[in-house]
Curated annotation (Swiss-Prot):
Residues 35-296 form the CoA carboxyltransferase C-terminal domain. Its main location: cytoplasm. Component of the acetyl coenzyme A carboxylase (ACC) complex. First, biotin carboxylase catalyzes the carboxylation of biotin on its carrier protein (BCCP) and then the CO(2) group is transferred by the carboxyltransferase to acetyl-CoA to form malonyl-CoA. Its EC number is 2.1.3.15. It is found in: Cytoplasm. PANTHER family: ACETYL-COENZYME A CARBOXYLASE CARBOXYL TRANSFERASE SUBUNIT ALPHA (PTHR42853), ACETYL-COENZYME A CARBOXYLASE CARBOXYL TRANSFERASE SUBUNIT ALPHA, CHLOROPLASTIC (PTHR42853:SF3). One of its GO terms (cellular component) is acetyl-CoA carboxylase complex. This is Acetyl-coenzyme A carboxylase carboxyl transferase subunit alpha. Pathway: Lipid metabolism; malonyl-CoA biosynthesis; malonyl-CoA from acetyl-CoA: step 1/1. Keywords: ATP-binding, Cytoplasm, Fatty acid biosynthesis, Fatty acid metabolism, Lipid biosynthesis, Lipid metabolism, Nucleotide-binding, Transferase.
Amino acid sequence: MSLNFLDFEQPIAELEAKIDSLTAVSRQDEKLDINIDEEVHRLREKSVELTRKIFADLGAWQIAQLARHPQRPYTLDYVRLAFDEFDELAGDRAYADDKAIVGGIARLDGRPVMIIGHQKGRETKEKIRRNFGMPAPEGYRKALRLMQMAERFKMPIITFIDTPGAYPGVGAEERGQSEAIARNLREMSRLSVPTICTVIGEGGSGGALAIGVGDKVNMLQYSTYSVISPEGCASILWKSADKAPLAAEAMGIIAPRLKELKLIDSIIPEPLGGAHRNPEAMAASLKAQLLADLADLDVLSTEDLKNRRYQRLMSYGYA
């Protein structure tokens, strides 16, 4: 798979293009008198060094771009790479099956767990089918149905957050979008089973929170979590989406800032260049964090889980 480079990665893209060009020449004519292997090796080392330098000093807007990267792993990618025996469950038993939310039972190191997550699309048709990862009320009601099923069978719940926000269409509002989100917030705070939430890409406002109330909340290194998109904030404050980079910095949407505010528990490091550069390595790190979180939560009684979750929620807003 050829990498899709972002604007701030263009110096890296130029080096990678040179490497690809030299490699192609070498493959076309193996009888060339010149040995280009050393040059390719040198350029690859230079590319890694340059990537380290660029990624060591990323701003909030650049991280927001990475969180939206079209090649970034989605929920179903992590399900495939980190879990076994996934059986997808569909429908809210009231209206429809919202493809922007996926969920089902799987095994994590042999242990049954309930997985729920946002799912964006890659190709145009899939993006439309998944509504670009923006759930309607039936998606959140499906998520709640699966959470209640997990509680009934005493299975831990693992959620993956990756949405620009809940779908704001007229139909969604008519079917009770705000009520569906509010009900999920309430019911998740009352769950009697361990619940682990991880932001894997965009954590967009109430659309993210509706599956984001848990005993542990993690973020991938280059994910974001915010009440509004940087473009939306800029449009309100400065009447121009061009001010999005300024808004991103001011809003504190990145993982280190949110951990500093005690809104999340852990930051999961990403491979050099972002999760899309090495999905397998990213999935391994994510799996290790989930197993560690489950080990921490397994020793707690149901009452302790609920009390800790309540105290966590009540602490929000205090420095």
